[in-house]
Amino acid sequence: MKQFMDENFLLSTDTAKILYHDYAKNKPIFDYHCHLNPREVAENRQFNDLAEIWLEGDHYKWRALRTAGVPEELITGKATNYQKYLAWAKTVPLCIGNPIYHWTHLELRRPFGITNMLFNPQNAEKIWHQCNEMLQQPEFSARGIMQKMNVKLVGTTDDPIDSLQYHQAIKNDESFDIDVVPSWRPDKVFKIELPQFNDYLVQLSEIADVDIYTFADLKKALLKRLEYFDAQGCKSADHGMEIVRFSAIPDESVLNSILQKRLQNQPLLEEEVAQFSTAILVWLASEYCKRHWVMQMHIGAIRNNNSRMFALLGADSGFDSIGDRTYAYPLSRLLDAMDKENQLPKTILYCLNPRDNEMIASMIGNFQGDGIAGKIQFGSGWWFNDQKDGMERQLQQLSQLGLLSQFVGMLTDSRSFLSYTRHEYFRRILCEMIGGWVEKGEAPNDISLLGKMIEDICFNNAKNYFK
């Protein structure tokens, strides 16, 4: 019987162990998509206690707590941090079989070095005091943890109207050598159907100093913000797409009419929503190309399912799930519309429903080219798929329908400074899979060849892709 989470956790073959320990383990982290608050990095936040750094804003843990019957008061309510922490300690033993059980223990091991005890009610008080003592030390500040985890770059997620003042402050601080770059997230622009669209355009108009009455005005305002983001080191644009829409792009006069209808709070037809969305996204893609940005699309979530809890807690509180809309055809047409004018940027496609894995893995092959290795990527297992089975499925289907060797690898997609252990989790799973191929005679026993492939997937490919 293997010991729980020893140094060879998830590694069952000699080849897998060599690949992980000699090639994957010590590669830096290039975390090209996350939801960290840049203010916490700029101000080098020192966390008061383990609950603050561990449970604050972590909707994965919140969902588990609710499922275990923990009252909301002990999750997002006014209970003390220690009370919330004890509720988590009681819940974790119930999570065996869920990736949260693995993540929780990995997060205690790195960066805290707790390897000799399980997280449960019996050990909770000891772990609380031990970790809290460390959290008061400079090396366990927000920046200290990033350095301890060997992070080289993080890409945050930022609205076009964000000031990016904290990114600028980090950039100007020569004492900190980790790149923290903004990523453009224009969801509130291309989703004209959102109730807050008109209010958002007022904000965009103010920050860009452009009156927005026409489609040309909107592009002018966005162009000023694109240039500002680019000057702040932006490398990527991300798009949350619950629905993938496509329609032939009409004349600009039609787009002006659609925009005017929306500004006057008149209802739009679905076709008009699709025309507007397609026009904005195709135009944005051309602007990304000019700036050599990567375009990311996160496809297929159903958000804010629980309207009662949404009214109480707002978005990103643990009430989202996997959607089942089909979108192969509109996605194909959208990418093709971008590509027709040779204006399709480097692109990463993520699907939330694993049913769509093969579709996405085959779709990316349609638009490769321009002498760019892995120009179009099938993104790592996302959200409900960033667990062992989900990662394995994504890796296997990418390897079978694309080139795994060109994959840009893992990202945290997280709000937590403790989530860098997800890169370790991914690397162990990757090495186990490739090591298994060798042991079964399905790949050559060429450690030098495979080791380079591992290093590329873990770090080098992403570094080169997001230049």
UniProtKB/Swiss-Prot annotation:
It comes from the Bacteria. GO terms for molecular function: glucuronate isomerase activity. The keyword Isomerase applies. Its EC number is 5.3.1.12. It catalyses: D-glucuronate = D-fructuronate; aldehydo-D-galacturonate = keto-D-tagaturonate. Belongs to the metallo-dependent hydrolases superfamily. Uronate isomerase family. HAMAP family: UxaC. PANTHER family: URONATE ISOMERASE. This is Uronate isomerase. It comes from Haemophilus influenzae (strain 86-028NP). The gene is uxaC.
